[in-house]
């Protein structure tokens, strides 16, 4: 008996008129949309994002010492694993003064990782690191870094994440610092800096 009542309860539906129903008044009725015919001879409009004036083709003129380097979460973790001092290794790679920058999203991501990554958190809170405030919603660090780099072309992105590297390679004029063979390397740098590749 109880089972029948339940099924009857779910089976009852609120019956509503369709917006195309003839019983509705003319003004309330939904009119069928007519498809516009496309003219094949018309020129197609394309939206191309305007590139900043600091770019000369792929060469970014805003990059210069002291270098501002946006650091990702996994870059700090892998640097600790490789026993590298972040600031000193960056200077060895670029032969110039480097200012590591860390966004609120990256900081929140490191804090979420918990007790296991407390060394990374201590390094991220180093006074030599610049703290960049985030105004957007959410704390997904990859989106935050990509958005910041797209807006301002004065940063180098330090990451080991393949997906993030792939996304940043699509943005012209942004170099990527990564870790290989226990040293930092840099790709897409306008001047030929970087540790030698073996």
Curated annotation (Swiss-Prot):
It is found in: Nucleus, Nucleolus. One of its GO terms (biological process) is endonucleolytic cleavage in ITS1 to separate SSU-rRNA from 5.8S rRNA and LSU-rRNA from tricistronic rRNA transcript (SSU-rRNA, 5.8S rRNA, LSU-rRNA). The keyword rRNA processing applies. Transmembrane segments: none annotated. Its main location: nucleus. Residues 67-166 form the PINc domain. Keywords: Nucleus, Ribosome biogenesis, rRNA processing. Signal peptide: none annotated. CDD domains: PIN_Fcf1-like (cd09864). It comes from the Eukaryota. Residues 37-47 have a biased composition (Basic and acidic residues). Residues 22-47 are annotated as: Disordered. InterPro entries: Fcf1/Utp23, Fcf1_PIN, PIN-like_dom_sf, PIN_dom. One of its GO terms (cellular component) is small-subunit processome. Part of the small subunit (SSU) processome, first precursor of the small eukaryotic ribosomal subunit. During the assembly of the SSU processome in the nucleolus, many ribosome biogenesis factors, an RNA chaperone and ribosomal proteins associate with the nascent pre-rRNA and work in concert to generate RNA folding, modifications, rearrangements and cleavage as well as targeted degradation of pre-ribosomal RNA by the RNA exosome. Belongs to the UTP23/FCF1 family. FCF1 subfamily. Part of the small subunit (SSU) processome, composed of more than 70 proteins and the RNA chaperone small nucleolar RNA (snoRNA) U3. This is rRNA-processing protein FCF1 homolog.
């Amino acid at each position: 008996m109880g089972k029948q009542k339940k099924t009857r309860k779910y089976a009852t539906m609120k019956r509503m008129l369709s917006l195309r129903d003839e019983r509705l008044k003319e003004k309330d009725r939904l009119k069928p949309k007519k498809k516009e015919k496309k003219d094949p001879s018309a020129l197609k409009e394309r939206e191309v994002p305007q590139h900043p004036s600091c770019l000369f083709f792929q060469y970014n003129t805003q990059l210069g010492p002291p270098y501002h380097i946006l650091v990702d979460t996994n870059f700090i973790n892998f640097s600790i694993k490789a026993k590298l001092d972040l600031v000193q290794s960056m200077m060895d790679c670029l032969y110039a003064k480097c200012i590591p920058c860390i966004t609120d999203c990256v900081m929140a991501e490191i804090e979420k990782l918990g007790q296991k990554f407390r060394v990374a958190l201590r390094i991220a809170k180093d006074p030599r690191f610049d703290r960049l405030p985030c105004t957007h919603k959410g704390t997904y660090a990859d989106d935050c870094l990509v958005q910041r780099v797209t807006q301002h072309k004065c940063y180098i992105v330090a990451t080991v994440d393949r997906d993030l590297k792939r996304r940043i390679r699509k943005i012209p004029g942004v170099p990527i610092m990564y870790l290989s063979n226990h040293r930092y390397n840099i790709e897409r740098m306008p001047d030929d800096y970087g540790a030698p590749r073996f």
